[in-house]
UniProtKB/Swiss-Prot annotation:
GO terms for cellular component: 9+2 motile cilium; axoneme; BBSome; ciliary basal body. The keyword Nucleotide-binding does not apply. GO terms for molecular function: phosphatidylinositol-3-phosphate binding. Signal peptide: none annotated. It is found in: Cytoplasm, Cytoskeleton, Flagellum axoneme. This is BBSome complex member BBS5 homolog. It holds the Pfam family BBL5.
Length: 443
């Protein structure tokens, strides 16, 4: 038995110019508020205005910005789990300096989102890269609601940050009190089995404990030491399988999940990962490279009351399937105003499916105007190329690995020299006299 589950979690992803299907609301996600006419300040200042202005939509899992003028859907999707800081910024008069990243630190403006030349600044990290996004409204109507938006953004971010237990596996946390698990809101205990062993991936001997199956997660804890415990939310499970014990006919019930920093003893060796199978389940490997995989194996040989492992695996499987079909992410904030959830992450000028023009909607074009069909095609091509080549690198502000020059102090050959192509936003191994991938082509 081995069941693989889709792991489409937009709150964990940071996507730039994502395909249309990545901007569709996932199960359990709902739109909270939307504002039109928002400028992406860090976009290339040479591109058309229709590419720099768009719609901001805030959901319970992410903040999405969608260009109103790009036929291929220039967009930004920032998962709330990737955000490290939210602040109020100060726009420079010289936009070229602003895009280059030369900025002044300004104290927050008493919770106001925008006043005059103020903007909202999002700092985020994803795949060991630091990103910075800056959004500024262009309409008077948006500015009048600035305080409302910033307060909602802060409230959603805090609510998401304080409900991690719904979405993230925790080890050795405060989830047990006086021999009983501390339940979440709306959580119900379905079954409880004693004397089930937890096996570590590095071969630590079994530790017997209580295996609790609830409506939201699996909880295991040791009665002798309640601080030794595990909480596994169903929405965070990558796979569920039965694994044979060497030298025995018995099997282990194994959960595979994305690892956190405090799970070193449960990390799986790379050669045991079935990466092709994981990628096959709808998410197509999005964000998978940023995950280490941890495995939690449970031994039911001494379970009280006795239960066949196949029966336990089937009941857990049903709970996971039900929870992932209708996930509860824990964030409870009512939507502000009327938001059409069918197209919540798409601007009002675009349809939810193909990012085309909705029936009955008049599209006002900006930039070069022409009456010829060929001219219109050229304009669309320019917009599409600009969004794919100029935007992504503009948001990267720091890196803990490849981008930039990495040289040894003594110029030794033990380290690679990496160069970041500013146009494509791709890091590559450089040679003397080469500053871009285009230069490599000329060779």
């Amino acid at each position: 038995m081995k069941e693989i589950f889709s792991h489409n979690r937009p709150d964990k992803l940071l996507l730039i110019d994502a395909p249309a299907d990545a901007l569709v609301l996932v199960p359990g996600e709902y739109a909270i508020v939307r504002f039109d006419g928002v400028e992406d300040v860090r976009a290339d200042p040479t591109v058309l205005d229709s590419l720099r202005f768009g719609t901001v939509t805030l959901t319970n899992l992410r903040l999405a910005w969608n260009s109103r003028g790009d036929p291929n859907g220039h967009s930004i999707s920032v998962g709330l789990s990737t955000i490290t800081k939210i602040s109020v910024g100060n726009l420079h008069r010289d936009r070229q300096q602003k895009v280059a990243g030369l900025e002044e630190s300004v104290p927050p403006d008493n919770g106001l989102f925008i006043t005059g030349n103020r903007s909202v600044v999002l700092h985020a990290t994803f795949n060991q890269l630091g990103y910075k996004f800056e959004l500024k409204p262009s309409s008077r109507e948006f500015t009048q609601q600035n305080s409302n938006f910033f307060n909602i953004l802060q409230a959603v971010y805090r609510a998401h940050d304080t409900t991690r237990m719904y979405r993230r596996v925790r080890v050795r946390s405060s989830i047990v009190r006086d021999g009983q698990p501390i339940l979440l809101s709306r959580e119900v205990i379905l079954s409880s089995i004693s004397n089930i062993g937890l096996v570590s991936a590095i071969g630590v001997s079994n530790v017997l404990g209580v295996f609790v199956r609830t409506s939201h997660r699996i909880i295991w804890f040791s009665p002798a030491n309640e601080s030794y415990n595990v909480s596994i939310p169903y929405v965070d499970v990558l796979s569920l399988s039965l694994k044979e014990i060497k030298g025995s006919d018995d099997k282990l019930l194994v959960f595979s999940i994305p690892a956190n920093d405090n799970m070193k003893e449960f990390l799986s060796p790379c050669n045991e990962l079935d990466r092709k199978t994981l990628r096959a389940k709808e998410h197509r490997g999005k964000g998978l490279s940023s995950y280490s995989i941890a495995t939690f194996a449970f031994d039911v040989q001494k379970a009280t009351p006795s239960v066949p492992i196949q029966s336990l695996a089937q009941s857990v499987l049903i709970s996971i399937q039900k929870a992932q079909a209708q996930p509860d992410y824990g964030v409870e904030i009512k939507a502000q105003g009327s938001v059409d959830e069918a197209s919540a992450l798409v601007s009002s000028e675009q349809s939810p499916g193909g990012f085309g023009v909705q029936a009955g909607v008049e599209v006002v074009k900006t930039g070069p105007q022409t009456n010829s069909k060929d001219g219109s095609k050229v304009l669309k091509i320019i917009q599409a190329v600009a969004s794919r080549t100029n935007f992504a690198a503009r948001y990267i502000v720091s890196s803990s690995c490849a981008p930039g020059h990495v040289d040894g102090k003594d110029g030794g050959s033990g380290k690679l020299t990496m160069t970041l192509d500013d146009v494509l936003g791709v890091a590559f191994q450089s040679v003397p006299g080469i500053d871009s991938i285009g230069d490599l082509w000329s060779l």
